[in-house]
Swiss-Prot record:
Source superkingdom: Eukaryota
Miscellaneous remark of the record: Sequence data obtained by MS from fossilized bones of about 21 thousand years old.
Residues given in the record as Ca(2+) 2 binding sites: 21
InterPro entries from the UniProt entry: GLA-like_dom_SF, Osteocalcin
Binding site for Ca(2+) 1: 17
Gene coding for it: BGLAP
Calcium found in the keyword field: yes
Name of protein: Osteocalcin
Modified residues (4-carboxyglutamate): 17, 21
Subcellular location: Secreted
TM region(s), chain numbering: none
Major location (coarse): secreted
Keywords: Biomineralization, Calcium, Extinct organism protein, Gamma-carboxyglutamic acid, Hormone, Hydroxylation, Metal-binding, Secreted
Length: 42
């Protein structure tokens, strides 16, 4: 198992991990900006 620092072991790649990264960006700069940066859309 791999520990991704989330406090729990994950036996597989979390399919929601990219969304979590977007959520973290959204907390810092706002959702629309985070979405645009991550997906490359306006």
């Amino acid at each position: 198992y791999l520990d991704h620092g989330l406090g729990a072991p994950a036996p597989y790649v979390d399919p929601l991990e990219p969304k979590r990264e977007v959520d973290e960006l959204a907390d810092q700069m706002g959702f629309q900006e985070a979405y645009r940066r991550f997906y490359g859309t306006t």
